[in-house]
């Protein structure tokens, strides 16, 4: 019998010979991980056996490169993968850990259908805690805070985090809250925003997290940005990033000039509605932005050149300025999710 496919999708993989990062189509099986240059390829470029392997997450071997996980095989070979965003990395980590555990116990991989309890166990589930903190009704309130002639948008204070943990009886005292907050910071669930919090996170203070009203933090997908004395051009540019992130992930995008298809990381924001796309293996600056206000988005069954495509799950965005963009999702379900999310965003704000 063929090993069962547990999870598949685009991740950015570090080359084993050269220090290059490239997007790959990654398939998690019950006994290993296969990775392909393209989703449509039949033969994998490589396979990582999971038996006896160990998983490290978060992996902070690469400085600013976030959402990285490391798999070390029994032959002490390290394999590094980078997800597009935090929840995606956590989903891969959960399934890989479970697959390794099933191999060790001689069991078949099976997902539990029981709903996850929101009440945190003694061993704190940081992923569940993070989701509770982000709850629009009962979570930590995101604020616009001012310090040293700068305005920090969509953030909160270190003491505010501890207050929230204590008031929700998730910790017994502020000292315990400090330990949990430091763990959230090291796992990437919280990010330092102000100079004070950044210096502490870099090891200048005794504790990486500060129970301090002047230490500012933010959620990694919150739409955080900082304003200071800046030119009109900077303000216009920042306007694009004010919106709250409502969806992100990797898609194939067709280039406008060469018409070739490349994997791009997309971040969808609403109010104002923008879809930014990035090189998934590259830096923090977007390669481009699609203004979605008043756009039309539809699924298409053929390539832009009119030929019937072998590739499935294509969709098209036509902006208000009549610029056409073509993308390809990995599955029909994913295409539907993106189309619906873009339609919602296109009706909001500016």
From Swiss-Prot:
One of its GO terms (biological process) is intracellular signal transduction. GO terms for molecular function: phosphatidylinositol-3,4-bisphosphate binding; protein homodimerization activity; protein kinase C binding. Keywords: Acetylation, Phosphoprotein, Repeat. It comes from the Eukaryota. Gene3D superfamilies: Pleckstrin-homology domain (PH domain)/Phosphotyrosine-binding domain (PTB), Winged helix-like DNA-binding domain superfamily/Winged helix DNA-binding domain. The modification Phosphoserine is found at residues 113, 117. This is Pleckstrin.
């Amino acid at each position: 019998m063929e090993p069962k496919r547990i999870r598949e999708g685009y991740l950015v993989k570090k080359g084993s010979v050269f220090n290059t990062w490239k997007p790959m189509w990654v398939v998690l099986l019950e006994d290993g991980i296969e990775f392909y240059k393209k989703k449509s390829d039949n033969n994998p470029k490589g396979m990582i056996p999971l038996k006896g392997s160990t998983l490290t997450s978060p992996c902070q071997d690469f400085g600013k490169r976030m959402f990285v996980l490391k798999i070390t095989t029994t032959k002490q070979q390290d394999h590094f993968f980078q997800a597009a965003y935090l929840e995606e990395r956590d989903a891969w980590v959960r399934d890989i850990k479970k697959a390794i555990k099933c191999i060790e116990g001689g069991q078949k991989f099976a997902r539990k259908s029981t709903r996850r309890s929101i009440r945190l166990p003694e061993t704190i589930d940081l992923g569940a805690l993070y989701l509770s903190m982000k709850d629009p009704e009962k979570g930590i309130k995101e604020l616009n805070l001012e310090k040293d002639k700068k305005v920090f948008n969509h953030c909160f204070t270190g003491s505010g985090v501890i207050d929230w943990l204590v008031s929700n009886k998730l910790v017994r005292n502020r000292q315990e809250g400090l330990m949990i907050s430091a763990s959230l910071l090291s796992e990437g669930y919280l990010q330092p925003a102000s100079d004070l919090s950044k210096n502490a996170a870099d090891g200048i203070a005794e504790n990486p997290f500060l129970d301090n009203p002047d230490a500012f933090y933010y959620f990694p997908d919150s739409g955080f940005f900082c304003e200071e004395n800046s030119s009109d051009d900077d303000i216009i540019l920042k306007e694009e990033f004010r919106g709250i992130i409502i969806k992100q992930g990797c898609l194939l995008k067709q280039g406008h000039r060469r018409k070739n298809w490349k994997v791009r990381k997309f971040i969808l924001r609403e109010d104002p509605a923008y879809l930014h796309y990035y090189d998934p293996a590259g830096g923090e600056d977007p390669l481009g932005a699609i203004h979605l206000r008043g756009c039309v988005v539809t699924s298409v069954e053929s390539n832009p050149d009119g030929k019937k495509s072998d590739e499935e799950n294509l969709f098209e965005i036509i902006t208000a300025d009549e610029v056409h963009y073509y993308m390809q999702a990995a599955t029909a379900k994913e295409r539907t999710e993106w189309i619906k999310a873009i339609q919602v965003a296109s009706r909001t704000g500016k």
